[in-house]
Amino acid sequence: LYHGPRNDLPRDYAPKEVIALLNERKNDIYCVRGNCDTEVDQMVLEFPVLSDYCVLAEGTQAIYATHGHIYNEQKLPPLHSGDILLHGHTHVPKCVVHETEQYICMNPGSVSIPKEESWHGYMIWEGKNFVWKDFDGQEHTVFRIENDSVRRRS
């Protein structure tokens, strides 16, 4: 909900509206704490937001979700072959398959402060698909988990 002291105030900044939108979807959201999130955010949100990480399962793969300021591509959490590291922090959407280390790194981008000329958007996980969308619902990129690897869907 907070943009941090190093970032300009986002255009159309409306944290109370965001709170209402998020709370409406509280049963659909898995959340991890970002480096600007605090106990004040937890007081107004109706789902947990202060966990440093969460581990989700997709078949035999683990999806290690974290903000990215502690664990990231340069400092990996414990991963097994084929696991997915899902982190933000850079505010730049991406999906990279690291063949040598045998893991996949994904970044959902940023809803409020996208960087490096990326779009205001988000990523959703539906079944075996990871979909990056903008606020108009346009799909920018879709990746699908197949046989413990990730493939770009055409």
Question: What annotation goes with each model-predicted range?
Answer:
Residues K26, I145-S154:
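Non-catalytic terminal accessory segments
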Residues C31, Y64-A65:
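Short catalytic-loop micro-motif centered on adjacent basic/acidic residues
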Residues A62, H69-D148:
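Conserved beta-sheet core of the metallophosphoesterase superfamily
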Residues L1-E58:
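Core catalytic region of metal-dependent phosphoesterases/phosphodiesterases
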Residues Y2-R6, E39-Q42, Y64, N72-K75, ...:
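Short acidic/glycine-rich loop or secondary-structure boundary segments that cap or lie
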Residues H3-R11, I113-K115, R151-R153:
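Active-site-proximal loop/helix segment associated with metal-binding centers of metalloenzymes
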Residues L22, L56, A65-H67, G109:
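Generic structural signal for conserved hydrophobic packing positions in ordered secondary structure
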